[in-house]
Amino acid sequence: MDASPEPPQKGGTLVLVRRQPPVSQGLLETLKARLKKSCTCSMPCAQALVQGLFPVIRWLPQYRLKEYLAGDVMSGLVIGIILVPQAIAYSLLAGLQPIYSLYTSFFANLIYFLMGTSRHVNVGIFSLLCLMVGQVVDRELQLAGFDPSQDSLGPGNNDSTLNNTATLTVGLQDCGRDCHAIRIATALTLMAGLYQVLMGILRLGFVSTYLSQPLLDGFAMGASVTILTSQAKHLLGVRIPRHQGLGMVIHTWLSLLQNVGQANLCDVVTSAVCLAVLLTAKELSDRYRHYLKVPVPTELLVIVVATIASHFGQLHTRFGSSVAGNIPTGFVAPQIPDPKIMWSVALDAMSLALVGSAFSISLAEMFARSHGYSVSANQELLAVGCCNVLPAFFHCFATSAALSKTLVKIATGCQTQLSSVVSAAVVLLVLLVLAPLFHDLQRCVLACIIVVSLRGALRKVKDLPQLWRLSPADALVWVATAATCVLVSIEAGLLAGVFFSLLSLAGRTQRPRAALLARIGDSTFYEDAAEFEGLLPPPEVRVFRFTGPLYYANKDFFLRSLYSLTGLDAGYSATRKDRGTEVGVSNRSLVDRKDLGSVSSGDGLVVPLAFGFHTVVIDCAPLLFLDVAGMATLKDLRKNYRALDITLLLACCSPSVRDTLRKGGFLGEDQGTAEELLFPSVHSAVETACARREELMAADSAL
């Protein structure tokens, strides 16, 4: 047990503080205990397992009917009304028929109602995931021999439209473009859902936390630009080939500029009117949202008016304007996704699963904190995974939590996930009765709805200057992620964001701040001598602070910083002393840190016999951990200082650092060594060092 060498005093009474050593359990014993706990079969365990998988069993019996029902019904109706036009519009992004978007919205709401732990999050179609699904669908369609420029929506698209020079993939002779497109989407969705379920079973909910907020914001920004680019041709009514792969955004805009003369005047006018109405309505809603009890369903009103105008104006027949086409009613028979396609899209499903999980967990945790309850990240993975796995057999594609609809749910009084059942009922009504009424809806109107929904993500670019002032490293992650999404691809943008995030993290720990500390007046506190004026440096003692972990990547910087600030290269000087060469001290300022990165062993450091200090105290409070290289660095440092008759002391070590020091052999086997080297505070270490020095000087004087 560790004991403080100088126990604190309280009211003149000494208080002895001893540390209870941690009881370490071996890996095999830990695995056995967890396996035994997991495999125990009893009624309470089975009940807990079922309640964990289906949280609705726990909260539904406690539902406060009078308090919650009105808000849940209202928010469910509003979200259902918003879902219908968004589902039809987002089918453009996914390259699928609108009916499949409605299926997806219906099943996702029901499954998350049963399995979700968040009371407010809305899980359903999400623009970024729709874009990622659409890119995979387009690529696989082209590989299968279908014309990539053929759109999914519109009349006559259920026919097999093939390239003249392409060879039809075996087994596709009886399956048209739309049939094969939904096969690809369901296979991709099933694989992504299986990844998410597997992550939930393995308790890997923490993995999504490695996708930082700047990364997600930059990814949303880059993906929004890509979505805007993909919808530009629908806004103008221009038919251009679908571009894939490297530089898709640039190639698409070049094709648009080359074919802008072929724009459909009817689509251009309709797009201009719809954009003006939607943007104006959104701005007014944002400005006066405190006065509106229920958000105005602008998208639905625009769709209704546009559909009526297109039908009675015969815009498709007279002006060649592209329309949604036939949207069937009812449900189709379930179908098992094609295993061959699943293997071909397995890699794409990984990025899809990671993005969907990250957005879902981050939104669930954010709204749980703001409303005073907790969510389970692992259960969220299972819930979102099941929202992908089960609906994949019913012609649905990937889903995740969506911020905009979640905000609407909260604003309209949502209290529990019962509102999702109401939303599913609204979608079901459209599926069974109202879907054919959208036959004459122009695709440019759907594109306008998608573009306007990107306002929030595109506005995040205004936050970049503030992010740069706050953290240049985070701003670099934001820019790198967004730029790679736009210039290369969505998947490459995600990888670039993760890479730069890890690089930023490594950079921050590789070169942390280092400083010499001095005493604040007569207090027991010490601060950076270069940052504050009027501090009192302890006589003949150097107090060094390193604000980061000590590990293999920064051990050299640790030594360079220490040697530069103290003016003594201990390794170089100890070697010269062993060789019998006179050593001296540098005349460099002890707090000058301008060349911390350029100081190397022996470069301009001349050390005399009188070093100006007899003890070095390292403030280990910011020292998070030590690895093998860090332990070896401390051992060598103590050895070199000892050769120069300088004492090395450590202060404010955390229990984990103390354990590492003991296991690494830094403290030795006896308790006395720890009490001589480790101190509970910087001040106690400094006072002990000064007291020991005075005792030695007194002993020398007596001799």
UniProtKB/Swiss-Prot annotation:
It is a multi-pass membrane protein. It catalyses: thiosulfate(in) + sulfate(out) = thiosulfate(out) + sulfate(in); 2 hydrogencarbonate(out) + sulfate(in) = 2 hydrogencarbonate(in) + sulfate(out); oxalate(in) + sulfate(out) = oxalate(out) + sulfate(in); oxalate(in) + 2 hydrogencarbonate(out) = oxalate(out) + 2 hydrogencarbonate(in). Keywords: Anion exchange, Antiport, Cell membrane, Glycoprotein, Ion channel, Ion transport, Membrane, Phosphoprotein, Transmembrane, Transmembrane helix, Transport. The chain crosses the membrane at residues 68-90, 94-116, 184-206, 260-279, 291-313, 346-368, 381-403, 416-438, 476-498. Its main location: membrane. Expressed in kidney cortex and medulla, ileum and colon (at protein level). Expressed in liver and kidney. Less abundant in muscle and brain. Expressed in the hepatocytes and endothelial cells. GO terms for molecular function: bicarbonate transmembrane transporter activity; chloride transmembrane transporter activity; oxalate transmembrane transporter activity; solute:inorganic anion antiporter activity; sulfate transmembrane transporter activity; sulfate:bicarbonate antiporter activity. The modification Phosphoserine is found at residues 586, 589. InterPro entries: S04_transporter_CS, SLC26A/SulP_dom, SLC26A/SulP_fam, STAS_dom, STAS_dom_sf. One of its GO terms (biological process) is oxalate transport. It is found in: Cell membrane; Basolateral cell membrane. The modification Phosphothreonine is found at residue 13. Residues 531-689 form the STAS domain. Sodium-independent sulfate anion transporter. Can transport other anions including thiosulfate, bicarbonate and oxalate by mediating sulfate-oxalate, sulfate-bicarbonate, sulfate-thiosulfate and oxalate-bicarbonate anion exchange. Belongs to the SLC26A/SulP transporter (TC 2.A.53) family. PANTHER family: SULFATE TRANSPORTER. This is Sulfate anion transporter 1. The lineage of its organism: Eukaryota, Metazoa, Chordata, Craniata, Vertebrata. The gene is Slc26a1.
